[in-house]
Amino acid sequence: MGPPVHHLLTGLCVGVALGWVGGSVPNLGPAEQEQNHYLAQLFGLYGENGTLTAGGLARLLHSLGLGRVQGLRLGHHEPPTGRAAPTSGDNFTHRLQEPELSVDIWAGMPLGPSGWGDQEESKAPDLHGSGPSSLDLFQRLLLLDHSLADHLNEDCLNGSQLLVNFGLSPVAPLTPRQFALLCPALLYQIDSRVCIKTPAPAPPGDVLSALLHSGLAVLFLSLPAPLSLLLLRLLGPRLLRPVLGFLGALAVGTLCGDALLHLLPHAQGGRHTGPSEQSEEDLGPGLSVLGGLFLLFMLENTLGLVRHRGLRPRCCRNKRDLGEPNPDPEDGSGMVLRPLQAASEPEVQGQRENRQSSPSLAPPGHQGHSHEHRGGSIAWMVLLGDCLHNLTDGLALGAAFSDGFSSGLSTTLAVFCHELPHELGDFAMLLQEGLSFRKLLLLSLVSGALGLGGAALGVGLSLGPVPLTPWVFGTTAGVFLYVALVDMLPTLLRPPEPLPVFHVLLQGLGLLLGGSLMFTIALLEEQLVPTVPDG
């Protein structure tokens, strides 16, 4: 590969500048040779037969990052970020005062034979003489009365607009001398950064839109509470366990997917605003993490099934020898009869007391919580934790909807998939503590109100005078990963008793479905944004 295009263009512009002020320089040979070198490099890369066609100019502008704005700018005539561009009045004054000085500069530029490869141009008379053909082009370029509406020198110009501004034909090939005239404009476009996308500040209407969408999301997330109570009443323990296993795996997939594919990329400043290639590059690392998590989850569960099947005949044989109940689900009765004389009455009474004093199994998803201390203090701790949990969920939703609709949608789905098994476990434990269904519904309404407060706080932190969206996203991603990998995933990997193959496959399906759902939303993020009115 040849030298970078930016270096070639910089060297060419330096050569042209030296040529312009060459009236006071006695020897212009090195400057012309350097200029010819860079011209030859550029025309060798993008030109044809010593000229630069419209297609070659378009490829050059694309390589320089010019010719097309890559996103919304701060305003149609506002300066780019980090640079004080001149105002419209300054531009107009500059153009009114420029011709006399510019003619003196152009007068020093050597337009005689310079080795540029154009025989007709090499025969052009010197500007110090009376050659009207040479002065005609320069005076049209310098003295042309460009209006503010026609000469958009503060906008990102494509190839056709550049040529029209310079009085050149958009379809005719460019000679090296004509291309040298465009060099300062290209350098100015690069320096002013008018073709670089800068994020637009959030207008006041976006605050109302973010508040509305986050409030609706919090109301939608209050549905898991009555759904949990309904499932606890309708489903028995035998059906509740596989359903909770599937929902728990779905929650792990959605929480990890939202953290890795949405929250962390947005917290680091990456946005899926470009083509699909840029989107795939942003999603690649997070998707690979999800793939590794899914593979190891299925591998560990498969090894557990194999180990359990290898140990089951020996365990069953030992239990039959001891006369204990056989918990093998494939056994129809689940019990093994033994003679009455094999055990004395005190032993039978002790086994009966142990069975009565053993605590009841908590629903899956809450195996990590300690339920040894009975009483009202446990219920209040659970309620306090649920209120704080809803407050942080509302905070995450407010920040997500402040960033965009697709980001808020993915966070809403992730929180919903996590809330259903979480509420099932909490309500099952509170029912064991003696709380009624009516009190549980009332407490769920109180925690939902805290979620609304958290959503308003998240919008205020994200769209306030000092935007804290990256910090909120980073904190939310950490919370989601902790809940998924520390609180929920160990419950799926360490069940209280070995799971059948169907349950393991159901959990794998839930994990895969949750990650795929977040990945689909990330891919369709650009298509989801226009579906929301601007407020």
Curated annotation (Swiss-Prot):
Catalytic reactions of this protein: Zn(2+)(in) = Zn(2+)(out)
PANTHER family: SOLUTE CARRIER FAMILY 39, ZINC TRANSPORTER ZIP5
Induction field: Induced in a zinc-responsive manner. During zinc deficiency, the transcript remains associated with polysomes and is rapidly resynthesized and targeted to the basolateral membranes of these cell types after zinc-repletion.
Compartments where found: Basolateral cell membrane
Chain intervals for the UniProt region annotation (Disordered): 316-373
Membrane topology, record value: Multi-pass membrane protein
Upper taxonomic lineage: Eukaryota, Metazoa, Chordata, Craniata, Vertebrata
Extracellular-side segments: 20-210, 264-285, 461-465, 525-535
The species this protein was found in: Mus musculus (Mouse)
GO cellular component: basolateral plasma membrane; plasma membrane
Protein task: Uniporter that transports zinc(2+) into polarized cells of enterocytes, pancreatic acinar and endoderm cells across the basolateral membrane and participates, notably, in zinc excretion from the intestine by the uptake of zinc from the blood into the intestine. The transport mechanism is temperature- and concentration-dependent and saturable. In addition, is also a high affinity copper transporter in vitro. Also may regulate glucose-stimulated insulin secretion (GSIS) in islets primarily through the zinc-activated SIRT1-PPARGC1A axis.
Protein name from the UniProt record: Zinc transporter ZIP5
